[in-house]
Amino acid sequence: MALEVESAFSLSYLLKENKQTSNNLFSLIQVPYTKMTHAKGKKTHLLRCILGSPFETLTKSSIRRSLKNLREVCNLPYCNFKKIPKNISYKYQNPFLKLYEINNNFINCKVGATGNTNSTYDWRNLSTIGNGWSVTSYHNDSVSRLHVSMVNNIPNSNTKKLSWWVTRVRSKNPWKRPYKVIYQRDFRDDGIKPYVSEFILYAPKNRADLEMQSILLSSVECFQDIKYALNYWTNLKFKEICNSALKRFTQTNIIITPVKPRVVSVNKAREVSSSVEVKLQRYEREGEVFVVSKAGKEDTRVLNDDNAIRNLFNATLNGGKYKLHPEAKSATGKRFKYYKDGFCWLDVFADANRRIPEWVKPHCLLTGSVLMSCGLWDFAKRKMVSVSHGLLHYDRKLERSSARAGVRDFVGASNEAVQREDFRDLDLRVEEFAERVLETANLRSDNRLIDNILTRASDYINKKSKESKELDINVCLSMDEKKMITNLFPDIQMSFNQKSYSNHGVFNAMRACENFYFSRKFKNSDYIDAGGDVVSTLRSKNHNVHICSPRLDLKDAARHIQRATVIDGLKGYGETISFCTNKTEDCAVNRDIIIAVEVYDMTLRDMAKAMLSHGSRKFEFSCIIPPEIFTKECNVELYEGRLKVTRIGDNVEYYYGSNGETFSHSCQTLKDILSVQVFQFGGRVFKKTLEHSRGQLHFFSICICEKIEPGSVKLKTYYQRSELDKVTLRIPVKDSFGVVTHYIIKEDREFVSSMIEYVANTGIKIDDKMVEWTYSQYRAKKTVTIKSGKVTQKETRIRKELIPGFIAIIMSEGIRAREKTHYLAKMLYTSHYKPSIVNIIFRLIMHFLGGTKRFIYESLVDCLKFLTNSDYIDTIVNTESRIEDLDKWFVFEQNVTITTDAEDQPSILEQSVKTFLSKYSEDVYERGDRSEFELEEFSSEQDLVDQLLNSGGGSKEDEWFYSYIFSIVRTKCTLSLAWRWTNRIFNFITSCRAKGKDFVKYIYEIIKIIINKPWEALCHYLVQGYKTVLKIPMTCVDSVNYLKRKSLEKILSYFSHERADDEYIFPGYDSDFSEESGDYGDENTELDSRSRCTVIKSKVEMLFRNIKGHIEKFLQRCGIIDQYNKIYHWFKSILTDVDCFNSVLNFITHTGCDALLAVLTGHFSIASCALKFMTDVVIEKNLSEKHHTTTKLIAGNLTQCIYKLDFIHPIWIPIRWGVKEISKIHIKKKLLNWRSTKEVTNESICKDLVHKSYIKYFDIKKAVWLLWFSLLIIFLHPTLGFFILFSIYPAIEIKRYYNNVVCFNNIKMSYPHVIDRLGGTYNFAKLKKAVREKFSENKSQGVKISEIPAEKDEDVMPPLEEVETPKRSVGRPSSKQDDIEDECNIKEDPTESLNFSNIEATSNRYDTLRVGNSKLCKFLRFYPKSKCYANIQTGDLIRDSIEEFYHLERSKLDIEISKMQRVVEIMNDTGRMLDNVRRMIDDRSMYVTLDGVSWYRLGCKDKNPAKEDFKAIFDHNFNIMEGNAKVKEFAVSSDEWRGMYSNERCRAIEQLFNDNNEMVRRPDVNGLKFYNKPPGAGKTTTIAKLMSKDLKNKVKCLALSYTKVGRLELIDKLKKDGIEKPEKYVKTYDSFLMNNDNILEIVNLYCDEVFMMHAGHFLTLLTKIAYQNGYCYGDVNQIPFINRDPYTPAYLSREFFRKQDLNYDTYTYRCPLDTCYLLSNLKDEMGNIIYAGGVKNVNEVYPTIRSLNLFGINVVGEVPVEYNAKYLTFTQDEKLNLQRHIDSQGGCRNAVSTVNEAQGCTFSEVNLVRLVQFDNPVMSDINQFVVAISRHTTTFKYFTPHSRLNDRVSNAISSLQSVSDFVLKDYHFRQCL
């Protein structure tokens, strides 16, 4: 953490900052002096004036130090300066200021400042925590206030800035100085508000405050004055550790090499003034003494001790120069001349002209913190050079250094210091070793070095992968092509996006890299692009760029059209570029730089002309030009055959890629570009330079040369040949006429050499045997390939007609090589013998004749060439060899003669330098980078290597503890052994600690189980026993009531109905067919309790019974039970009396209301409350016989004066009255649910009828309008508005109470049994309406009950509850039903049958007023006689499908009824013990209730009750009732009876058949069209688009969806298309089937996910729709119809759909490429591919290539919880377990679903989890598999147990490992242009 601090606590520091600060402080100092002038003798205290202000920054040590300085300067050794001495007062006009200056100057002299030097303190330091923060400002605003602000230098941190405000808090204790700290944390994200908090220093409230305190204290730790002011002391323990590490590091680095004497010059680094001389003198007493002689001054004697170097430096320092003697001793006692390097830090003090303080010890190496303490760190680090890790060298010759210097680094190393030889290239060795390790197949090793290298290699790879890419390559490339591009441009970080395709993609990528190279080189601005692509420039970050793009030919014109088309679609590109269609040499835009990327049509003269026209200094361009164009037979292939360059005459042809257009360029232009290096144009000389080459891609630059010396210059340029591994062969071919022609081909050098060597080795002469051997070797040398297990030979580059000539050349060359070898060997062998004189003369004659022969031969050949064809002559003459080995280099040489005029032209470089110096003339130090860098650890490179070899690559868990162990071990052994033993000790301690934790945890769990489980079981059975005892008297009472009720029912039997004839009315609402999950208790706790406490259960029960009997006997003897019974009967008599009950209720409501209002107004008093209640009781007693509510109301409000007179405001009267009455009403309603208070509450409610006359004229409708009017008045007159509001609203509630509750209870008292039977029916509504009319005085005369209009829901209420019940009607049964009734001899009851409520499940209030005629199906009405155990098919597919579906639904109802019957029987037999019922049933779909409110699920794992809503329930007599009916004993129900969907489906099917079981309505299937689309193909989107088009054209249409989720998705899409009220046109299949009895006529019908239905279900639906066109969408390969009845097969569920013609689609917008690959290759059980046309992604955004991942788990706890992921399971049990795990970890965005529930949905990330190890058919089902892997767009993760990593999903994901990326990319649709 770099700190930049301006200290404002000490005046000695602030006075040196600037004059303004000094003047301000002088004014502060002079204030006490002006006041002092009025005092006698001008004597006052000097501490405030001399030692600085304010007092908070002064410490005792600073005061003593300053007083000591004043005594020495003023020569007053015993003066305490409490008063100004007289001599000082008389001598100076302002003695306070003068004494302050004297003190300050003395301090400066003490630290080494001279009188003529103005020192500037720059207080910047590094914090001890080293966390990358930088303090930008640090000052005090007032006397006791401190402000610190810090800016974060870490780029990845979220925090931007921290600020502290430290303020001193007043304290009674003068020795305590508490400070309050307010800090603010600013974030980099502007959307996050700053975080502000405060705390007391050294007393943080939380962890955040503690962190802020640590950062604050670490930033001020280096400043003593601030530390003293804040009472902060450094952690001594931490300081000891730092000092030990520092000492160890210093010792390691000082003793590096053996001591060798050296001779140093007297002049250390600069010239030393000749006036200073240093001589060494030796004395017997004093020892060695240096005598420093200066001209004109006295000699100075310096003792040669351990401070001699420092003292000599201070004595000889003069103007930045100093002189040291070689015999001077350092702090270690070593002579200065023996130090090979070090002490460069002396130059720091010399350059600053500062003396070395006394506390500095002259070691050869000095830490940067010492220089910082001396105020020289900022000055020194500008010229620091990093020699090695932790070692710095101060170089006085540097102007600016870029080295990272830290205050913990050591300064003093020599710049020539050489690192250890074996560590010099350590990074390269590690990198090379990591590459070799990564190339191996097996990366496992027990070597710690290998593990460490692998860890670092992986970290390096991760780091490189996270680096931001500079250039995006959008064209598709293979791996070889990508490697080729990255090898050509290793300096560019590229990202390959694979978004487009080209036949020559490599060269498109190369052009992109070349453009980026030039753009980056010139900082993306201020250049001209000759022939550039304007589209690429617009898309890049370039600005102020001019593009010259002329139309030179047809290709340029076509390019312009293509680029114009792209530009028309661009948006958001506003960079400043310019464009013209002129030639570059004809354009006049001024720029200094011109670039051209692969522009081959511009000659060098054109480029020079362009430079002159644009006023440019430099022209840079790139071209692909092979040097072989200088040969006539130029035919080369570059970049592994992707580019072919051929010379044809004077043109050079370029062939890019496998297919494409040919580009032709002038050969002479390309030759000039390669060979010409200097040329002249327009009187100017231009120099072409080859900057660099990347293969045959050359980068050139052209510059204007000025001020050239005249003379001749020879320039050479060389280029490497393109094909270095080839040789040229001239192969003869003889035609049918015997004419021999020669063809030139190129062949691999190694292949040809191997063949020649073989012939030379095996052949003696040319014969048939030699030809056979040569052909055999030729066949063996050809390249072979292995494909599909077969070995095949690849064809060679030699054509078939050239093979004989090629073999002939090989044989001739081989035999000739053999002969030459034989001849030369003999010649050389004979040359070993000394020749005779005759042989010498003979050889001279032969040599002369040989030269003459050559001359005559060549002359005759030249004549023949002149007379005949020279090429043919060359072919005949060149018989030496027909194999030519090509040269490796092409060298071009140019001789240039330069002549110049005498006129001297100014230099361009001089002009640029002058411009730079005039523009940037600031001091380089002021413009330098003042930022600090992060701290680095104290360790040398040797330490790093030791750690690398011994650490093993593990992470440090406890750095402090590790360092502490190392510090102990280091004192006993060497460094290498210390690291090794420290690792072993630390690993042993860590292992013991981990094992200890596990052992303690294990013991703790055992103790916890031993203590908790028996205690929990004991408490559970004690509570159950206590509840059982309490239920004994209630059971007796219930038995008596049961007998009474039975007798009463016999008397009123004529009111009873036949339950079997009741007709149910059900609303039709949408269904997802998804099972609902309920709440679960802690199943483990229950199971453990049962398993461990079964033994003691019986004993505890027996013990409890014995204790209970003894207690009852004891209490009976003591008479306590008798007294308890008396009190209980007395209290019960009070509650059963109506008058007492009303009095108690009035006391509670009146007192509570008055107390509440008194508390709200602040006037509450217990005495006033008691007096108020007594007064009200007296008034109530006096008016008890007179029912005057108004009188009571006035009297009650008058008693409010007991609290306070201003409390009797008019608005409080209606508030008090309304609160009391409403509270009383709600309390009575609640007490009705209590068994003990139910009777007296009913009687009290009935007595309220006498008060109805007070509100008989009150109309609710008018009151509602008055309420709205009061809201308007509130804005005009608040008091009046609130008065009306609080007066009207209680009156409305009271009116409803009288109409709905009081009247009903009075009727119920007369007809209790009848009212109970009629409750909740339409007849009950009629009766209640008649009663209200009877008791109302303004009733209508002559109106029949049947003619009463429909009332609002607020006026029709069931008994005892505030639930709205709409009007109901009774429908007539069908004729077929009547026949069945006649056959069954069922007599019709004179009373109307019982009907269920028709309340729709909707949030709209007014939908509850709809009236329906839905009835129970025939199967339920005539059960069990209506059972049918078989379904007989007729041969009609449509009818058989419908009847099969009807049979399945009836079977489902039969199973549900059987389950209900069994539960009822068990409940009656077991005495309603839910635990016993659960053990016998164990069905989570079944529910039981004892009171009608709390329902208990009958699963063994479920314990907690919940509120459920059912359409039908079964009572204890197995009578089916309405879901909200009153439960007397108990009731049971199941999930099926929530909506009774099967009943509604059966009713819809029954309407299709008449009494003779004939179909009266058949579905129309002629206009249907079926479309089979794969997952993610946009089925819902297609329907939405078609419907939107129909609705806009006013065409009647309807869309049906299988699930509610699909319906909502379709509605949402229609809303986005602008369709109003789209819910009218979109329904679910069940909703439409249940709610529509009439036939709907439409034009277009759209069905979504049609294959999820049973065919009979779909056909039944079509009978209710008359359509013209039907469009059905689905996927036959996804989850089909699921038969819930395990005993009834569904043979025809999909038969109808199989008969239809399906239109198949192959496109998807959702699935990634690997998912498309799996779906395209997926086969069914018969081996047929389910998606015959495959599945391809057609999304415009390039999809994810690999998205499927596989993970093995052991338990559900190992499944990671990802907030944005969607979790799927195969079964419901897995879903519940996974949901419980996710909820325990904090939950996620989406709830867990099964695969079936997720069909049709799309998610970004999907996690499929399998928790069970046993096989389930669902998990291997192909339809489940298709849905599971096709729900995601980016990522899919499959978590399965390790033992099931071979299931279907795992095998499919694992198979993708052997599929390459380029294979997967084929499943992305690409449109060819």
UniProtKB/Swiss-Prot annotation:
Its EC number is 3.4.22.-, 2.1.1.-, 3.6.4.13. Pfam families: Viral_helicase1 (PF01443), Vmethyltransf (PF01660). Gene3D superfamilies: P-loop containing nucleotide triphosphate hydrolases. The keyword DNA damage does not apply. Residues 495-674 form the Alphavirus-like MT domain. The record marks 413-414 as: Cleavage. Signal peptide: none annotated. One of its GO terms (biological process) is methylation. PROSITE patterns: ALPHAVIRUS_MT (PS51743), PSRV_HELICASE (PS51657). Residues 1538-1705 form the (+)RNA virus helicase ATP-binding domain. It catalyses: ATP + H2O = ADP + phosphate + H(+). SUPFAM superfamilies: P-loop containing nucleoside triphosphate hydrolases. Residues 1356-1381 are annotated as: Disordered. This is Replicase polyprotein 1a.
